[in-house]
């Protein structure tokens, strides 16, 4: 593929550093997955290692040029290759009676939607390479400048672990920022509720505003004050001052108690 030009529209930045590829593979191998679903096969740099695990594998690729290359070069079979947009795929349909590990180098523009689809699915673990800044927001501490609605949402449902940081020079074409490999593991003790995410978006809508002011267009102020006080919180509290668990407790009390 000497004449191949990465697509800016698809956000293609291929991992070309062999040391990084081997580190990712070693980490995935240590997780001892039952099966693998790789998002964005690309030219198959990581794929060639993942196939050595000799476990069920599916690779998702949207670029028709790469699909042809992967099949012509016999890197993947028709059965192993899933063609099309990952956001239009049912994550639960890849394997029956198996819980595959999801992994991939994801374009920044679709990282949040993919994580949401992962949360909605039955899959339990996701090894994700993403922009360093995005990873920082996912892992941000309460009351920090990076703490956000989506970060709090993910932290409530997931255990998020930084695996290692990856320099931008490990990719071709070289992106403007460094990347981070993270592991997302679902917390078994909580059930997914997408409406919690909608609630958080409103809570964090204007960070400098008090929580009550961000929610008063949806709930009566007296009603909000009563619930906040029952949670032993100050009435001037802001969303970014609350932990994911505190925010979920407020969500349950505010939304479930609404007449």
Swiss-Prot record:
Compartments, record wording: Cytoplasm
GO molecular function, one term: RNA binding
First-level EC class: transferase
S-S bonds: none
Keywords of this entry: Cytoplasm, Methyltransferase, RNA-binding, rRNA processing, S-adenosyl-L-methionine, Transferase
One annotated GO biological process: rRNA methylation
EC number, UniProt record: 2.1.1.182
Catalytic activity: adenosine(1518)/adenosine(1519) in 16S rRNA + 4 S-adenosyl-L-methionine = N(6)-dimethyladenosine(1518)/N(6)-dimethyladenosine(1519) in 16S rRNA + 4 S-adenosyl-L-homocysteine + 4 H(+)
Chief localisation class: cytoplasm
HAMAP family: 16SrRNA_methyltr_A
Reported function: Specifically dimethylates two adjacent adenosines (A1518 and A1519) in the loop of a conserved hairpin near the 3'-end of 16S rRNA in the 30S particle. May play a critical role in biogenesis of 30S subunits.
The name this protein goes by in its record: Ribosomal RNA small subunit methyltransferase A
Gene that produces this protein: rsmA
């Amino acid at each position: 593929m000497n004449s191949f030009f990465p697509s800016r529209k698809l956000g293609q930045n291929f991992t070309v550093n062999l040391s990084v590829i081997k580190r990712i593979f070693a980490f995935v191998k240590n997780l001892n997955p039952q099966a693998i679903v790789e998002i964005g096969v690309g030219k198959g740099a990581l794929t060639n290692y993942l196939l050595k695990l000799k476990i069920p594998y599916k690779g998702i690729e949207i670029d028709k040029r790469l699909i042809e290359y992967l099949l012509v070069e016999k890197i993947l079979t028709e059965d192993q290759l899933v063609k099309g947009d990952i956001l239009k795929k049912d994550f639960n349909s890849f394997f029956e009676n198996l819980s595959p590990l999801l992994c991939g180098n994801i374009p920044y523009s679709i990282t949040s939607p993919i994580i949401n689809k992962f949360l909605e699915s039955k899959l339990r673990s996701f090894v994700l390479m993403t922009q360093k800044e995005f990873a920082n927001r996912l892992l941000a501490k309460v009351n920090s400048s990076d703490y956000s609605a989506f970060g709090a949402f993910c932290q409530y449902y997931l255990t998020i672990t930084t695996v290692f940081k990856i320099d931008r020079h490990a990719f071709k074409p070289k992106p403007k920022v460094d990347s981070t490999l993270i592991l997302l593991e679902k917390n078994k003790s909580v059930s997914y509720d997408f409406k919690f995410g909608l609630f958080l978006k409103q809570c964090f809508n204007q960070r400098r505003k008090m929580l009550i002011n961000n929610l008063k267009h949806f709930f009566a102020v007296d009603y909000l004050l009563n619930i906040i006080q029952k949670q032993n919180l100050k009435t001037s509290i802001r969303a970014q001052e609350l932990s994911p668990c505190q925010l979920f407790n407020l969500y349950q009390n505010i939304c479930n108690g609404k007449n």
